[in-house]
Amino acid sequence: MNVLNSMKTGALLTMLLSSGMMIADAQALTVYTAGPGSLAKSLATGYEKQTGVKVNIFQATTGKVMARLEAEQANPQADVLISASWDTAEELEQRGWLLPYQSPNAKQVPAAFKTDAYVAQGISALGIVWNTGSGTPEPREWNDLTRPEFKGRVTTPDPSLSGASLDLLIGLQNSMGDDAWALFSRLKMNGMVIAGPNAQALTPVLQGAKAAVFGAVDYVSYSSIQDGEAIKVIFPASGTVVAPRPMMILKSSQHAADARAFVDYVLSEEGQQKVADAWLMPARSDVGGKRPLLRDLKLLPAQSGGSADRSAVLQRFGTLFSHP
């Protein structure tokens, strides 16, 4: 699945609108990031306070961030990229766009979440998000959402727009085999709706129009709970997948030393605490969090055989849900 070939429309306009800022702040570090805008601002503020180096931030969905990178190939602007999809880092490394760097602060990051060219900023997990006032029984397992009480009341993120959602499908397939596809078929027959990106899947549950999300990215829901929303995040005991958020330095960066220092800061104890405050799991195993961490979850084997296998799963799922 080529994430860089989607959502190019509009990226060029955004780039032109912001070009004056980029020129004015030629000595600033430029960070492109998907995910919580408040976290990006907090990390930028902490880094600026520590180093005196100004940080320009472009925050959007992963698709829009990637489209902007593509549009700027002739005149690259980004120094550091933080994506919500591990796939994007793998693809950019294959293209030769990344500057290898191993931060000394990455020693406490598990090996599964770092390479020579990129490292997790933080980690989210996928679960069931349930509206506690929906009048439905609390689900404990993925299969519970196929019960009659949930008929027509479940949403799921579109796996063609959410790499983490696709990871969950692959993880369930790896763990359950054909039983996973039987589960997906029952969910479809029970009226589960593919609702676009992660936020669009969650919104009708927050509004009470739907009862639950199958495969919701957790940190957004935890933030909503803090804001008073009547929802609950449930991680099935049978297992789930996690979504590490890769951070990388672009080879085209004109501020490589500052970019390395920014990565170091994000992976410092102070930076990782900011990640935890945004309801993500810190990448470092020695920094705590205020939500379930890796050790609290049973993880499904989410590895695939590469882009061809991912495309095959995506196509099969799309075909299943396109048929009446």
Q: Where is each model-derived feature located?
A:
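A ligand-binding cleft/hinge motif common to bilobed small-molecule-binding domains
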Residues: 87-91, 211-230
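Extracytoplasmic ligand-binding site segments that recognize negatively charged/polar headgroups
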Residues: 34, 38-40, 76-209
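Periplasmic-binding protein-like
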Residues: 111, 124, 184-188, 194-195, ...
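An extracytoplasmic/periplasmic, membrane-proximal ligand-sensing/linker region
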Residues: 178-182, 283-324
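Bacterial N-terminal signal peptides that target proteins for export
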Residues: 1-11
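Mature extracytoplasmic/periplasmic domains
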Residues: 250-305
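Early extracytoplasmic/lumenal segment of secretory-pathway proteins
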Residues: 27-91
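A bilobed periplasmic-binding-protein/Venus flytrap-type ligand-binding module shared by bacterial periplasmic
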Residues: 127-134, 173, 243-255, 274
